Amino acid sequence: MAGWNAYIDNLMADGTCQDAAIVGYKDSPSVWAAVPGKTFVNITPAEVGILVGKDRSSFFVNGLTLGGQKCSVIRDSLLQDGEFTMDLRTKSTGGAPTFNITVTMTAKTLVLLMGKEGVHGGMINKKCYEMASHLRRSQY
């Protein structure tokens, strides 16, 4: 799905994000486009299944993983009409910095963004939501 790389380029253009991905979640979940060599390119079908699954209760206790990166769930509105967003933060290992992540959902895709160190989660959320809104208008 090479055409999706332009969406990744657009999401990364202003320099506030360190990672981005477009993931198809219907039928056979897979990464359609992502920043090469970063975390989201490694997202597994099992991780996608957990993200879009009906069981939302364990997120806040256990967190979840994206591309093998452990994350804490801050706010889960992914399955709520009109919102379709989930805000997360990476878990620190060995005192490393943590980063804000937003996941937004469309009819066929998940849009994922990870901000750079010090970038406010609200900025990432807004950018991710706007891309998802564009994809929804384009029937994705």
From Swiss-Prot:
Residues with Phosphoserine modification: 28, 57, 138
Entry's Gene Ontology BP terms: actin cytoskeleton organization; positive regulation of actin filament bundle assembly; regulation of actin filament polymerization
Pfam short name (any one): Profilin
Glycyl lysine isopeptide (Lys-Gly) (interchain with G-Cter in ubiquitin) crosslink location in chain: 54
Keywords: Acetylation, Actin-binding, Cytoplasm, Cytoskeleton, Isopeptide bond, Phosphoprotein, Ubl conjugation
Covalent crosslink: Glycyl lysine isopeptide (Lys-Gly) (interchain with G-Cter in SUMO2): 54
Residues carrying N6-acetyllysine: 108
SUPFAM superfamilies per the UniProt record, alphabetical: Profilin (actin-binding protein)
Family according to the record: Belongs to the profilin family.
Subcellular location as annotated: Cytoplasm, Cytoskeleton
Gene3D superfamilies per UniProt: Dynein light chain 2a, cytoplasmic (3.30.450.30)
UniProt-recorded Gene Ontology molecular function terms: actin binding
Listed PROSITE patterns: PROFILIN
Positions of modified residues (N-acetylalanine): 2
Keyword Transmembrane helix: no
Record PTM Phosphotyrosine, positions in chain: 129
Protein's name in the database: Profilin-1
Subunit structure: Found in a complex with XPO6, Ran, ACTB and PFN1. Interacts with ACTB. Interacts with VASP. Interacts with HTT. Interacts with SH3BGRL. Occurs in many kinds of cells as a complex with monomeric actin in a 1:1 ratio. Interacts with ACTMAP.
GO cellular component terms given for this protein: cytoplasm; cytoskeleton
PTM section of the record: Phosphorylation at Ser-138 reduces its affinity for G-actin and blocks its interaction with HTT, reducing its ability to inhibit androgen receptor (AR) and HTT aggregation.
Gene of this entry: PFN1
Keyword Phosphoprotein applies: yes
PANTHER family in the cross-refs: PROFILIN, PROFILIN-1
